[in-house]
Amino acid sequence: MAIAVNQLTHAQSIAEQDPVVDYMNAIDNIEAELSAYSIELSDLYLGLGKSLYSREEYENARRAFQRGMQIERVNYGLDSLTQAPYLISIADTESYLGNWDESQKALENLYTINTKAYGANDVRMLPVLDQLLDWYMSTYKERTPKGGYSNLVISERIAARMYDILKTDMPLDDPDAPDRYRRLGYLQYFIANHIKQHGEPSDSGLSISMAGSSGRPSSATTSHMHFRRGKLALEKVIEALVEQPDSTEIDQAMAIAELGDWYLVFGQKFSATQAYQLAFDVLETTENPEQARTELFSAPRLIEFSMDKSPEAVLSDKSSESQLELSMMISTYGVANQIEVTSSPQSLTENQLSKLRKDMRSKRFRPRLVNGLAAEAPHSMLYDQPTPKG
């Protein structure tokens, strides 16, 4: 045993020098001293797989991950939770090989072993559901529109599981509750935006067992369905913030304003106006109401329901060499007009300028609020330089 441990430690310490060879030598030594299924081997196979993966030797990496997982199963059982890092690594590797169905099988296996350990609706399922949602969202851009839609369908089913667990097992005063509900709301925008850009495939070809399918809704109701689901999640954010012991009026006002943003993006202008007015009024009990209102609502703000940011994140004020500076007027409905380029690293063609203006008009901004009511206002922002096509 001491020899095996020494080999493992030695392999780990010199892995950075020549990782693949060193891992293979350590594996050979442990197999010779102990057995082909010695538990000390599993970590070495995981390290070997990661080294091969970093070299883009994906088929060899997959074999290493599968071997490590097999050793875990022999030692700890077919449903052991120790398989988790191997299953995630296999899913990553299969995705790079273009085997998306195999990636999904590995992730379904990860979900299954956790449900067997905890139960499908146990709060301890949240970390693995987070991991699955992160995976499907991070690989979305690597897929075709139809493949990306498949990722989003699965992501929504994962989110439905998370929502059920949150409602049942996570009290609203839990510190994680606001961010968790917020992320579920943002996902609905992501899905609705994909459908707006690419349409909805008639057949996604999915058979994931995480939740049952209730059938495909008609195109006329799809947008409203995602609007409603996102609205419910963002309302839960507000409820959770009210229950937080350290929540401030500013936190609550920002969450209410974000609900107003949600209404505005989905064309519910009257409801957006009501939400913005409420957010403005909530600040009345702060130490310095006018200062808070000025800081939060005196200028337009681009509405972004991004899965990769917190609600407090704003556009950087620091321009880079590849960014343009734009000026515009933001209407009371959050639409950009009179869009002009005020500073550019290089001149734009008429076609590039036309596309830029079209893109900006498709975005929505939280309008400036004056006494709680939307008002037209000038706005400036940075914009990524269009990439020239050669």
Question: Model-predicted segments: where are they?
Answer:
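A generic tandem-repeat structural signature
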Residues: 59-140
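Residue register of alpha-helical TPR repeats
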Residues: 43, 85, 124-127, 179, ...
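N-terminal leader/linker segments that initiate helical-solenoid repeat arrays
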Residues: 1-51, 55
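Tetratricopeptide repeat
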Residues: 20, 24-27, 62, 69, ...
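Charge-biased low-complexity segments
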Residues: 7, 12-13, 35-39, 92, ...
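Heptad-repeat amphipathic alpha-helical coiled-coil interaction surface used
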Residues: 20, 27, 34, 41, ...
